[in-house]
């Protein structure tokens, strides 16, 4: 790539003048953290640790770890490849920027300047031309010049550091030429390597790499070649939107965490395009809007994302809706989140995403709006046809009942889990029956355990997994599965799924919310041979589940649920795990319902689950009609009859 001969005496003041005209980064960061002393102290502690060469990375078990002064950029010190790539993303620089904004202490920008100079010196870019079989390995895997890390650096830590150092006059004459040369190295690599790695533009890595390329062009837009960088990036980002965002809005991998990560990147592209005067096509902007809708529907009423697949129950929704407001000026997503998440919690969550939320004041949003139920004109269900996912809830409030239900077989890639027709259920402000999260990407026993069907809210036959776990990101023997239907009627919402993982046996599952207060899980297994037991698994977010004398399972927490299963199922409890962040797990209780019957043909199983706080509802025995297509039960003075005929569901409620 031909590079412009630079007149440093001219270029530096041009660039600095432009960046100083932007909103001052330190002022904005101080505004976000003004009344958040705990968050400020947490960030200051992290930044001071970084000045001592200690950072928290994958494999350090959530504790500061000495990575060197300067860091050993190439070295995997904990036998975890993510350690190297995260170190080379320099996310601790962001904490140092905030720490300076709060304290004015020069030690923080001095660390950024010294580490940037050391990285440029210690990590020369490998050649991007030549035999592809020799070039490719240098930009894949846990290496400083992994193409993914190159893209992430440009749009995140390096862009933030660039703006900060320029605005606060810490970009030194010695560092600036090194910085420009390294950005040019990044741009050349991002133009040439990723298109060969991802020719279909269908992976989140390619999205990261092209947003990074666009940001390289923004940082050095005074250089003639920057327009070429941004033109290629824009062209490829439009392909990314087409190939990575489905028509219904979900990101193709179907993991809410990665979805929000991708929306963060699309949003940052849109913001950079605004600053650079580049217009994004209207159809691409509409796809991004649809994607923000998905993020909202995949939000638990507890204020956390559903940890489906390789996801955590995180708070990225704050970043997503904040970026949505910054890009589109639309408040509907912010209004919905403000109804679900209390203001003080929302402000605390936003401190984790300061750089994405410049100019977003949740304080003013909450004070300016009256969040009455009848004013929020958002549907209560969302069917992602291409992802084979359905999300529905009883309302946009923290006590609503909500279901995330999916049946995507085969999985799109290794970020999926072995959970066909699985679901995640919340009620009364608590996640009750949950997806276990992700824990790690390392090749170890816990990775397989977390991905197992038996750790999800699923059904197994003969104790066998629906398909085979090969390694951390690979499965085998996947068959087919899909969502069949989403239906809504008076007092109910129901969705149906089917998969052939145990062929010739066919598993159908219907999940419904009835009467705004009950979760119904109806499993139907056809072509049973009578040779193997059927197990239904529920991963319960509790340690107090116990079997009552009438056969009901009940919990004894602040927020509880009771479960009554149809007759003929043996109930026992197994230890479970829930992971809410990388490298951390806590115990849960798995409820196992087992049918050891030997009859052949069709079998039906029904679970009635009711959330409650203090007084456990009395659920009667659950009975099927002889044909297995009609089931009935009562709760208190209400009698319920459910019919599931030929893939159609009908529900009747009567009061005694």
Feature locations, PLM:
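Extreme N-terminal leader/anchor segments
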Residues: 1-56
């Amino acid at each position: 790539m031909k590079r412009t001969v630079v007149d440093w005496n001219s270029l530096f003041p041009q660039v600095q003048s432009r960046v100083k005209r932007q909103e001052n980064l330190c002022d904005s960061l101080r505004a976000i953290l003004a009344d958040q002393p705990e968050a400020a102290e947490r960030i200051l502690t992290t930044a001071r640790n970084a000045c001592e060469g200690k950072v928290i990375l994958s494999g350090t078990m959530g504790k500061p770890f000495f990575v060197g002064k300067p860091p050993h950029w190439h070295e995997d010190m904990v036998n975890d490849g993510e350690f190297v790539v995260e170190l080379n993303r320099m996310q601790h620089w962001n904490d140092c920027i905030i720490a300076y904004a709060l304290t004015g202490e020069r030690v923080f920008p001095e660390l950024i300047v010294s580490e940037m100079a050391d990285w440029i010196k210690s990590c020369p870019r490998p050649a991007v031309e030549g035999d592809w079989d020799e070039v490719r390995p240098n930009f894949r895997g846990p290496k400083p010049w992994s193409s993914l890390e190159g893209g992430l650096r440009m749009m995140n830590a390096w862009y933030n550091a660039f703006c900060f150092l320029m605005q606060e006059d810490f970009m030194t004459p010695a560092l600036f030429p090194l910085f420009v040369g390294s950005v040019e190295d990044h741009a050349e690599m991002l133009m040439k390597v990723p298109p060969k790695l991802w020719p279909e533009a269908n992976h989140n890595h390619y999205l990261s790499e092209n947003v990074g390329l666009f940001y390289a062009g923004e940082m050095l837009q005074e250089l003639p070649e920057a327009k070429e960088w941004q033109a290629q990036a824009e062209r490829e980002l439009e392909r990314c939107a087409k190939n990575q965002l489905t028509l219904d809005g979900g990101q193709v991998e179907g993991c809410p965490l990665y979805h929000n990560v991708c929306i963060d990147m699309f949003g940052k592209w849109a913001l950079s395009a605004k600053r650079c005067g580049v217009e994004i096509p209207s159809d691409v902007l509409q796809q991004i809007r649809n994607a923000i809708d998905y993020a909202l529907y995949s939000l638990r009423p507890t204020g956390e994302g559903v940890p489906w697949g390789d996801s955590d129950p995180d708070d990225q929704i704050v970043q997503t809706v904040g970026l949505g407001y910054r890009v589109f000026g639309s408040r509907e997503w912010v209004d919905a989140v403000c109804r679900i998440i209390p203001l003080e919690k929302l402000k605390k969550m936003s401190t984790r995403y300061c750089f994405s939320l410049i100019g977003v004041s949740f304080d003013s949003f909450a004070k300016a709006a009256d969040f009455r139920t009848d004013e929020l004109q958002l549907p209560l269900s969302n069917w992602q046809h291409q992802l084979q996912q359905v999300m529905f809830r009883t309302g946009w409030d923290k006590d609503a009942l909500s279901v995330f239900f999916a049946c995507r077989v085969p999985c799109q890639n290794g970020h999926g889990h072995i959970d066909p027709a699985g679901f995640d259920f919340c009620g009364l402000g608590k996640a009750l029956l949950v997806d276990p999260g992700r824990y790690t990407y390392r090749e170890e026993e816990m990775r397989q355990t977390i991905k197992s069907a038996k750790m999800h809210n699923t059904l197994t036959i003969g104790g066998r997994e629906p398909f085979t776990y090969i390694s951390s990101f690979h499965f085998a023997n996947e068959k087919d599965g899909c969502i069949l239907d989403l239906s809504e009627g008076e007092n109910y919402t129901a969705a149906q799924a089917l998969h052939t993982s145990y062929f010739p046996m066919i598993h159908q599952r219907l999940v419904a919310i009835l009467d705004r207060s009950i979760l119904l899980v109806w499993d139907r297994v056809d072509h049973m041979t009578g040779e193997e037991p059927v197990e239904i698994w529920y991963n319960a977010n509790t340690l107090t589940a116990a079997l009552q004398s009438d056969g009901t399972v009940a919990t004894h927490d602040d927020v509880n649920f009771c479960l009554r299963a149809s007759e003929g199922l043996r109930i026992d409890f197994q230890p479970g795990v829930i992971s809410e962040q990388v490298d951390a797990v806590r115990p849960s209780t798995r409820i196992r319902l087992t049918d050891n019957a030997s009859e052949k043909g069709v079998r039906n199983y029904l679970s009635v689950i009711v959330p409650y706080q203090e007084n456990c509802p009395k659920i009667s025995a659950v009975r099927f009609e002889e044909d297995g297509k009609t089931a009935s039960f009562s709760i208190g003075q209400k009698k319920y009859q459910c019919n599931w005929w030929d893939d159609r569901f009908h529900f009747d409620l009567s009061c005694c």
